Amino acid sequence: MTRSLKKNPFVANHLLKKINKLNTKEEKEIIITWSRASTIIPIMVGHTIAIHNGKEHLPIYITDRMVGHKLGEFAPTLNFRGHAKSDNRSRR
């Protein structure tokens, strides 16, 4: 279910402050965050944000095509290693 257009997109305050500070200094630096629920807004374009996936922080470069999506969409949390092999030889 999408967020109402009457409301603004959710962006964590600490993340917004860090991005605004880097934009005023015109610096590029990796921003570490745990806020997977934050929406990507246009002022984030061009920054690299390290998003937590539950184990480590994955650095993601933000492009203009990502605007409107959530940060968590780009850092998968599950690591599928395939289905278990059938072990018929050990049963014999």
Swiss-Prot record:
The keyword Ion transport belongs to this UniProt entry's keyword annotation: no
Main location group: plastid
Subcellular location: Plastid, Chloroplast
Entry-linked InterPro entries: Ribosomal_uS19, Ribosomal_uS19_bac-type, Ribosomal_uS19_CS, Ribosomal_uS19_SF
NCBIfam families: rpsS_bact
HAMAP family given in the database record: Ribosomal_uS19 (MF_00531)
Known function: Protein S19 forms a complex with S13 that binds strongly to the 16S ribosomal RNA.
Family label: Belongs to the universal ribosomal protein uS19 family.
UniProt name for this protein: Small ribosomal subunit protein uS19c
Organism: Helianthus annuus
